[in-house]
Amino acid sequence: WFYRCEALKQIEGLEYLNTSEVKDMSGMFSDCAALTSIDLKNFNTQNVTAMSSMFHHCAALTSINLKNFNTKNVTDMGGMFLNCAALTSLDLKNFNTKNVTDMSWMFYNCAALTSIDLKNFDTKNVTYMGRMFSGCAALTSLDLKNFNTKNVTDMSWMFSGCAALTTINSNTTWQCPESKDMFAGCTKLKGAVSYDKDKVDATMANPETGYFTAESTTVRSR
């Protein structure tokens, strides 16, 4: 629709778009590099199954209104906000992610994002989380206590480059596959132990001998 409208700074009249039958919104605003804000509160997304790369490389975007998004049928959110480097906040509290299988690269290089509330995220069906938060250089903490990772097969580089990240709160059932460079560049991260640049793989994804923080947990690496 608006793919690679690189000089586009604003969009008017989106409330008149009938999106009730749309199933695929992948790449819809991808590479709208000059767009600074977008209000999608009137979008009907009840039938959408794919939102991958929807806002990919919207590098100047500072705000997105997604409060009325119905995501109950969405299965693919991979790269959804990839390289939204100017976003400082993102309200996803209404997101229903129960059917999502791909969250890889979802917030990759959201370099100005200082916090994100994912407490309502249902991740029981997610299989891909590789690079999910990679490059989120301004994030200081992540609360992932509600994350169910039993079906995840790839967490490679999941938190890599999160240079300001000090705390990752995990739950008691976090399971982690063997994943390369999961914590690379997370130099301020501290859980049970402080960060060690030579220990950045999935073996450190636990709160007992690794970088996660939790009251009492048993975390398994498979």
What is the predicted role of each segment?
Residues 1-222:
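Negatively charged
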